[in-house]
């Protein structure tokens, strides 16, 4: 599924119903008093998180949402019907911003809990409300007020347990395809992943975690170069980061220098990301069939990065070492979630 992480929409709450101007007119009661009823309140617009959704793609096709207007009041002191509220379902983790001011209106992270985004208009008052001892036949009413109207920017941060980090063509898309049901676009040129993608990795019938395939970064991404820093934000909610490195780049670049460039981007964008658990994944070991040469390359990378945390050597395209990696990730995620409970 194509993963869309931003959308611009317009929402408009319902207008309140107008108050009614009416007088009681019945046989043998020639001068009945006022009996104009109030209007109904306009419908409000709520956002609600749904765990069944994981994309904002629907908002690319429907951009305008309007709640029902309140009904106007009627004679006989009948109040108009309230406009029906509109509840818009969004994926868990959706951030709702006012597109005009940039204000964060809501972080929709709890499924099943409606969050008010646009308040419906207040009902108008009928002429009955203005009856007094000095004005027995008021002709005054008030109209219903308009509902709130907002231009919104929806932003979805990937709710994933594992984030894949690395330069373009490090093999992240291949890895996520190898261990999950994700069908990420894979080819031998940079930026094959143009949208963040999610893959569910199932290590047993009752154990699974979500892996986020973040588009490849280049030097300067924190300032918006390449595919820009818009993708770095997807790493903020992951439990663990996998730093995927191409052990034998076809362009002859230095894997250590490549890795340091990514770490530099992380530091510039958000230094707190460096405090997350980060594991080193040395990919494409199939490109170095000689065992001695491969081991020397692995050790030189570890030494060059002064890496102290876990290291996994894999071939994503041949699924070598991926099972061990997934079991280790599942164990870490379980431990982290237990400690938070």
UniProtKB/Swiss-Prot annotation:
Residues 129-144 have a biased composition (Polar residues). Keywords: Cytoplasm, GTP-binding, Hydrolase, Magnesium, Metal-binding, Nucleotide-binding. Its cofactor is Mg(2+). GTP binds at residues 166-173, 191-195, 213-216, 283-286, 315-317. Residues 160-334 form the OBG-type G domain. Residues 128-150 are annotated as: Disordered. Gene3D superfamilies: GTP1/OBG domain (2.70.210.12), P-loop containing nucleotide triphosphate hydrolases (3.40.50.300). GO terms for biological process: ribosome biogenesis. It is found in: Cytoplasm. The keyword Transcription does not apply. Pfam families: GTP1_OBG (PF01018), MMR_HSR1 (PF01926). Monomer. Belongs to the TRAFAC class OBG-HflX-like GTPase superfamily. OBG GTPase family. An essential GTPase which binds GTP, GDP and possibly (p)ppGpp with moderate affinity, with high nucleotide exchange rates and a fairly low GTP hydrolysis rate. Plays a role in control of the cell cycle, stress response, ribosome biogenesis and in those bacteria that undergo differentiation, in morphogenesis control. This is GTPase Obg. It comes from Legionella pneumophila (strain Paris). The gene is obg.
